[in-house]
């Protein structure tokens, strides 16, 4: 794998199949789609007709009803593009002109190197404009960044401004011609459009959300069977608009259905399309031949030289055919074949004599009319019988057009339907269709025509889409070229082709479609989903604009902003992000769950399936899923198969179809291809693809001529599901020799969805990698190939639920995907530019950027990058996001290198759990049924301790009775309850809190009550505060115990801030100032470095005195060094005399000074603006004066009841935590850390966990061996020799040989905790390799050893499997689930207690439990449970009174549910009364003494 090795962790890789291409960026799906939708960083002239641009152009221009004014769309802009100081404005500053074709070329200020012109393929110099004040290029400047939006509960967005043009016309009342009176253009603010963050998510109202891509049925034409292949169905499905279905029944009648309404005859539809007569319809679908009558003989006429279909083929000749020269072309009785027909045409024979019997089954294609009398002898579509023919001959008719429905591919359906059809004109047909679609509406010809035309031929109402047109062309014409795809409505020919294909299906010509084939399902990603919402909003807005234009009094003075109200558009966007089924709260449990959520595909959602109606076929794994959708990762519940995940290498093409990469195979040899990334001095163009050998030859030739070579990258062929069907594709594990030739004669391959054994010469492509099949989560499971599919599914899903631990640890047995996943998830911090680490602490890393330019060229590659690390931030799932630096001061970092670990990452690799020593054995019944026995060591040493952060907020509002107040002065609360609140009433950071503690004190005004004179007097004497307010403080809810880690206070603008808010603000300002000081220090250092490069080591020729004080600063012959330059001012530096001084030096000194001071000024200005923003106050919802957020961190140690799991679906609950000394121990006295039940393996068939155990043990022990060796030998040569001995016969030996001494020692040091392995999915280590490693580690090759009972010291009878497994703690923690209720809330209507932890509810004593008590005759317990403890409101109060008075009697009242029943009956108009009758009083129960 070509990944950068980070921080010296080397995984020993077992894979035999080299990865030829890198895994594409894992969240590219989201980013690419949204970028294509917004096209925000492109100028209007550069935008494609896609996304927002396409939506605006499809809805505009909008014309009023009178046709005298028109509103057009000109262009749009998103966000403010300017430099840091605001001096440069506009995107055009990031453009240059192509030296070859003059087109505008996009430059990239952050990546040095040439930029490509996409029009002509020429490379141009990368020359964006840099501001001469701040030295920065133009960038998107936002009001609030991501972190601020999360804190303040805002949406991360940028303003959308649209330029509109309003044209007003004068209309000539006579001719109706329009002339332009006035044109006005104006920019209209539309609203804020949410932006995507770097990690592919959206911040909506302060919470991070993900838009899940939807898998839906592709638009196009589809054919399917109905009723067990007796007849077929054809559908034309558009992207937007009416569906059309064609079907025929057993009686061979063609029907059409529009939008699933009532069906009508197909010929009515054809007439409405413009086929006026029966003859038109018949000629469109059937092959028509001309039969001539001469001298009462019949002749079949042919048109020589013109190849057209004829019904002659298949006919037996009744007369021999002779050429003009008398040569016999075909003898009589011969069957006419295609070759005979060619001969006939070759000899230019124009007619063949036939007999009457040859016309059996013929029908006339056009009316046969007696020219003398005008009588219609035969109507079109009538059968041509012998007596009809003789009548014709008698009438002297010389020719007749015939067709043969039985012989024709199309069959008898059209002919039979025509006979049923009573409608004869297109006008009647349109009215008939209108009646079917709008039953009840009286039809007129105009409305019927408008309706029918609008359905399929109006681009505003019907969109077949580029995809639909592409699928249509592929299905009906097998044509894939991208031309003609912009024809997005239908025309009559499209319907004719569809009907023709449908009718031919009966003759097995063509194929029906498999609806679950991935060629027929496509992905709608974020951009497209949002595009549809925008269109909905714009269409609503269009109606409003049209109405406004019509009623506006004075259109001549109107401006575009008077007409446009963008609220419906922004409401549609808000609704989509806030409440759409596909806009989901991001699963942020750990980095893997984030990545998986972004790569998820859902078949649910608007326009998709519903889980109730989805059948088995849709959910099932389909052969086309191979390499596109993971067959393993899918939920276990009702959504199984409907929600899936993209495979590792899969990508989504421009049409929305999923593609998978393959390598080319020619003649049984795998050919590596490359793609040109820079043409150098060759004639190739960027993007050209060629064989690697050809490229290498070209490069050698260029180097020989001392020219610049071609820059290349590996290329693979991405194929969509329908393209793949044409080829034969071998699996990645087919054995190859060193030249790439497939070694075995027969190869396992896939062809058109079937798995076949085929000759190697017939192979066209081969898979890129075995990982290609599975998704990211499944590719993180080592030995996946040894696990049963159901368990692999659980393993992949449970990794997503793993909780970030206090100390992350990468797995000893990994798969090699850990680094890629961590990097692409955004959990780790990557260096933006190369440089040297200037300073590091727990909160930030400063990288001093290196300028790789001429020392005098003041480049922007100067200065520093400050990385603010995230500290103890709460995630969506309340887990803790914390970043820790992994670099040291002085380290050199490259661009893209990991400089800080995030949650669940260890040295840039994903680490979801811990490596623990496990034995498989039963232990006194404590690990029965998947339960887990754990050593106390794991609790003591915080192996599985995790931190969870809860957020609580309280707002002080302005109420009708007066403002609420956040204060420490709360009525009737003891001082001890307030001990941790500061003077502002907010809890201090670091305070330990438990349930019931006050976090923020708040008082709310009470309604005024009538006071007695005595109370008024007391009020007047003692002050009135306490009386008229009540306590509304925020208290810690039950089940929460932890430490306050952060407090945030937001005050409304214009409100006086309290002390605590000022203190928090002070801390934030201090941070900003500290960063500023560091940036200024680095800039001044850089200035010195440049001055030193200019003046350093120069010898002074004369003494230098200060101009003003005349103090001597330098003596003659002094040598200028850094310190000297630093203490002399710029003014005096310019006066220094030394040998061969360049006259331009003083200019250069001025330039350096000016640049530095300008950059420092800009930095100060930016910090000043940030401080002003902090001091200004916050934007809060209406009515809110102050908002306080308190964050509480809880430490969750491993405890009994927590759920743990391995990566193979082996999950269980902790049943007991045993003291270390009681755990079973190895022969050297090491106690095991976890005991698992061996019965969990055989029936589950997840043997991967056993192989992982063995390999993990070997890795751990080898690490121990290296550590022991390095204690005695720290010399590099010795270490190298030792490592070579340990890893003999592996690829790692070559790696050890290549490393220099310093790196070698670092690698060896990194191996002391264990040797890390990469056992890739389907290409992992073999049993023999594991045995060999166990042997090298000095362990038994069986992987079993004898254990001793920690309680008795006795040896167990049988050897036990022992080793290291990677175990995860899942986010199903017992502390979050356990719950107890005393007295809590009751349901409002039934008055019964609520259920569930969230409602502080109780356990339901249900029907079956009542039966149990009835069986025991426990009447009093039952009475109490069903009345007082449930819904007897009167009885509840009586019991309370009885307890207070110390009485024991219980007096049940009427249960509230009885009253509910009575109300229910009364609502049905049944008058129910309760009639009380006096009963004898029952003897009271005797109270116990």
Curated annotation (Swiss-Prot):
- CDD domains named in the record: RNA_pol_B_RPB2
The highest taxon in the source lineage is Bacteria
The catalysed reaction is: RNA(n) + a ribonucleoside 5'-triphosphate = RNA(n+1) + diphosphate
This entry carries the following GO cellular component terms, namely:
DNA-directed RNA polymerase complex
Which Gene Ontology MF annotations are present?
A: DNA binding; DNA-directed RNA polymerase activity; ribonucleoside binding
Functionally, this protein is described as follows: DNA-dependent RNA polymerase catalyzes the transcription of DNA into RNA using the four ribonucleoside triphosphates as substrates.
Which family is it part of?
A: Belongs to the RNA polymerase beta chain family.
Its recorded name reads: DNA-directed RNA polymerase subunit beta
Classification lineage: Bacteria, Pseudomonadati, Acidobacteriota, Terriglobia, Terriglobales
Q: Which gene carries the instructions for this protein?
A: rpoB
């Amino acid at each position: 794998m070509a990944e950068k090795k980070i921080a010296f962790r080397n995984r020993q890789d077992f894979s035999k199949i080299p990865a030829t291409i890198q895994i594409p960026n894992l969240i590219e799906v989201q980013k690419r789609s949204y970028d294509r939708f917004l096209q925000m960083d492109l100028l209007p002239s550069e935008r494609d007709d896609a996304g927002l641009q396409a939506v605006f152009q499809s809805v505009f221009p909008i014309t009023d009803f009178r046709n005298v004014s028109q509103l057009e769309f000109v262009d749009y802009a998103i966000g403010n593009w300017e430099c840091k100081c605001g001096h440069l404005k506009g995107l055009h500053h990031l453009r240059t002109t192509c030296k070859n074709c003059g087109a505008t070329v996009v430059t990239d200020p952050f990546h040095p190197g040439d930029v490509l012109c996409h029009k002509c393929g020429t490379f141009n110099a990368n020359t964006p404009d840099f501001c001469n004040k701040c030295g920065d290029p133009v960038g998107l400047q936002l009001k609030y960044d991501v972190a601020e939006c999360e804190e303040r509960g805002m949406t991360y967005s940028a303003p959308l401004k649209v330029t509109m043009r309003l044209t007003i016309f004068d209309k000539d009342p006579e001719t109706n011609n329009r002339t332009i009176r006035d044109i006005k253009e104006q920019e209209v603010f539309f609203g804020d459009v949410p932006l995507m963050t770097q990690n592919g998510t959206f911040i909506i109202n302060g919470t991070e959300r993900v838009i899940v891509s939807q898998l839906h049925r592709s638009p196009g034409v589809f054919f399917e069977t109905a009723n067990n292949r007796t007849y077929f169905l054809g559908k034309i499905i558009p992207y937007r608009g009416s569906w059309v279905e064609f079907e025929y029944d057993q009686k061979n009648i063609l029907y059409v259905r529009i939008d699933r309404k009532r069906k009508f005859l197909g010929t009515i539809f054809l007439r409405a399309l413009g086929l006026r007569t029966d003859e038109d319809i018949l000629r469109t679908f059937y092959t028509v031949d001309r039969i001539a009558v001469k001298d009462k003989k019949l002749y079949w006429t042919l048109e020589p030289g013109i190849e057209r279909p004829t019904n002659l083929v298949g006919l037996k000749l009744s007369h021999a055919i002779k050429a003009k020269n008398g040569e016999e072309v075909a003898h009589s009785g011969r069957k006419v074949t295609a070759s005979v027909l060619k001969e006939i045409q070759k000899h230019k024979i124009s007619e063949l004599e036939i007999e009457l019997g040859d016309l059996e089954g013929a029908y006339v294609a056009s009316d046969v009319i007696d020219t003398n009398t005008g009588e219609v002898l035969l109507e079109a579509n009538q059968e041509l019988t012998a007596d009809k023919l003789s009548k014709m001959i008698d009438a002297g008719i010389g020719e007749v057009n015939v067709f043969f429905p039985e012989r024709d591919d199309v069959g008898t359906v059209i002919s039979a339907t025509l006979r049923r059809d009573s409608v004869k004109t297109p006008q009647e047909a349109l009215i008939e269709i209108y009646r079917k679609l709008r039953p009840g509406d009286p039809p007129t010809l105009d409305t019927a025509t408008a309706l029918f035309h609008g359905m399929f031929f109006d681009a505003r109402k019907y969109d077949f889409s580029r995809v639909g047109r592409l699928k249509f062309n592929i299905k009906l014409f097998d044509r894939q070229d991208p031309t003609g795809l912009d024809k997005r409505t239908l025309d009559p020919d499209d319907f004719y082709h569809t009907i023709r294909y449908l009718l031919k299906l009966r003759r097995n010509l063509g194929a029906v479609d498999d609806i679950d084939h991935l060629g027929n399902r496509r992905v709608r990603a974020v951009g497209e989903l949002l595009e549809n919402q925008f269109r909905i909003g714009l269409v609503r807005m269009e109606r409003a604009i049209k109405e406004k234009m019509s009623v506006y009094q004075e259109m001549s003075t109107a401006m575009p902003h008077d007409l446009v109200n963008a609220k419906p558009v922004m409401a549609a966007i808000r609704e989509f992000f806030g409440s759409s089924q596909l806009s989901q709260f991001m699963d942020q449990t750990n980095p893997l769950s984030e990545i998986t959520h972004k790569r998820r595909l859902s078949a649910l959602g608007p326009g998709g399936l519903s889980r109730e109606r989805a059948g088995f076929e849709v959910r099932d794994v389909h052969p086309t899923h191979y390499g596109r959708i993971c067959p393993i990762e899918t939920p276990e519940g009702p959504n199984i198969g409907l929600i899936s995940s993209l495979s590792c290498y899969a990508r989504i093409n421009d049409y929305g179809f999923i593609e998978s990469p393959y390598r080319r195979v020619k003649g049984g040899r795998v050919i590596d291809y490359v793609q040109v990334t820079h043409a150098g001095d060759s004639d190739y163009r960027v993007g050209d693809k060629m064989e690697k050998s050809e490229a290498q030859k070209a490069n050698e030739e260029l180097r020989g001529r001392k020219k610049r070579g071609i820059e290349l990258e590996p290329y693979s062929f991405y194929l969509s599901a329908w393209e793949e069907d044409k080829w034969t594709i071998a699996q990645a594990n087919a054995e190859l020799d060193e030249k790439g030739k497939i070694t075995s004669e027969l190869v396992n391959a896939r062809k058109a969805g079937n798995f076949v054994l085929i000759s190697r010469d017939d192979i066209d492509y081969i898979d890129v990698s075995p990982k290609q099949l599975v998704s990211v989560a499944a590719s993180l499971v080592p030995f996946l190939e040894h696990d049963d599919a159901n368990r692999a599914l659980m393993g992949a899903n449970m990794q997503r639920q793993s909780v970030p631990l206090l100390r992350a640890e990468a797995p000893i047995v990994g798969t090699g995907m850990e680094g890629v996943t961590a990097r692409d998830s955004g959990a780790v911090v990557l260096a933006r530019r190369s440089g040297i680490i200037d300073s590091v602490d727990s909160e930030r890393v400063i990288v001093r950027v290196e300028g790789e330019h001429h020392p005098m060229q003041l480049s922007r590659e100067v200065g520093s990058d400050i990385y603010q690390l995230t500290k103890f931030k709460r995630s969506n799932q309340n887990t803790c996001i914390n970043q820790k630096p992994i670099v040291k001061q002085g380290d050199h970092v490259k661009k893209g290198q990991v400089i800080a670990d995030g949650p669940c990452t260890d040295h840039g690799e994903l680490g979801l759990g811990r490596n623990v020593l496990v034995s498989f054995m039963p232990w006194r019944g404590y690990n029965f049924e998947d339960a887990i026995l754990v050593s106390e060591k794991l609790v003591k040493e915080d192996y599985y301790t995790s931190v969870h952060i809860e957020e609580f907020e309280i707002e002080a509002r302005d109420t009708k009775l007066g403002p609420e107040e956040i204060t420490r002065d709360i009525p009737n609360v003891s001082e001890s309850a307030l001990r941790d609140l500061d003077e502002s009433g907010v809890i201090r950071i670091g305070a330990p809190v438990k349930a019931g503690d006050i976090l923020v004190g708040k008082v709310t005004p009470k309604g005024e009550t009538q006071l007695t004179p005595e109370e008024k007097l007391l009020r007047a004497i003692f002050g009135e505060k306490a009386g008229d307010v009540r306590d509304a403080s925020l208290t810690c809810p039950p089940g929460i115990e932890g430490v306050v880690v952060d407090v945030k206070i937001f005050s409304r603008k214009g409100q006086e801030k309290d002390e605590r808010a000022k203190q928090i603000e002070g801390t934030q300002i201090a941070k900003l100032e500290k960063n500023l000081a560091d940036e200024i220090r680095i800039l001044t250092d850089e200035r010195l470095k440049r001055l030193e490069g200019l003046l350093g080591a120069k010898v002074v020729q004369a003494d230098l005195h200060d101009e003003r004080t005349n103090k001597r600063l330098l003596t003659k012959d002094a040598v200028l060094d850094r310190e000297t330059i630093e203490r002399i001012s710029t003014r005096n530096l310019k006066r220094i005399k030394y040998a061969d001084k360049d006259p331009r030096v003083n200019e250069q000194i001025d330039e350096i000074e000016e640049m530095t001071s300008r950059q420092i000024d800009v930095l100060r200005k930016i910090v000043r603006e940030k401080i002003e923003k902090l001091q200004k106050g916050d934007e809060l919802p209406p009515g809110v004066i102050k908002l306080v957020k308190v964050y509480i961190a809880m430490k969750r140690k491993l405890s009994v009841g927590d759920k743990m799991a391995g990566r193979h679906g082996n999950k269980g609950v902790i049943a007991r935590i045993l003291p270390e000394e009681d755990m079973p121990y190895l022969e050297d006295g090491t106690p095991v850390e976890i005991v698992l039940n061996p019965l969990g393996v055989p029936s589950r068939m997840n043997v991967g966990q056993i192989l992982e155990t063995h390999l993990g043990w070997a890795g751990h022990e080898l690490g121990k061996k290296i550590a022991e060796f390095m204690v005695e030998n720290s010399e590099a040569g010795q270490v190298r020799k030792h490592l070579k001995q340990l890893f003999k016969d592996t690829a790692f030996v070559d790696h050890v040989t290549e490393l220099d001494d310093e790196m070698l020692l670092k690698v060896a040091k990194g191996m002391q905790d264990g040797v890390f392995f990469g056992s890739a999915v389907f290409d992992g280590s073999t049993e023999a390799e594991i045995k060999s490693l166990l042997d090298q580690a000095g362990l038994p090759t069986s992987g079993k050893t004898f254990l001793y009972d920690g309680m008795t010291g006795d040896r167990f009878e049988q050897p036990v499997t022992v080793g290291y497994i990677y175990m995860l703690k899942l986010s199903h923690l017992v502390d979050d689930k356990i719950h107890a209720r005393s007295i809590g809330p009751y349901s409002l209507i039934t008055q019964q207690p609520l259920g569930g932890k969230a409602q502080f509810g109780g356990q339901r004593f249900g029907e079956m439990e009542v039966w149990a008590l009835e069986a025991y005759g426990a009447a009093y317990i039952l009475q109490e449970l069903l009345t007082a403890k449930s819904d007897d409101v009167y009885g509840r109060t009586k019991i309370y009174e009885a307890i207070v008075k110390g009485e024991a009697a219980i007096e049940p009242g009427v249960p509230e549910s009885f009253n509910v029943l009575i109300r229910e009956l009364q609502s049905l108009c049944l008058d129910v009364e309760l009639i009380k009758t006096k009963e004898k009083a029952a003897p009271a129960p005797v109270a116990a003494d």
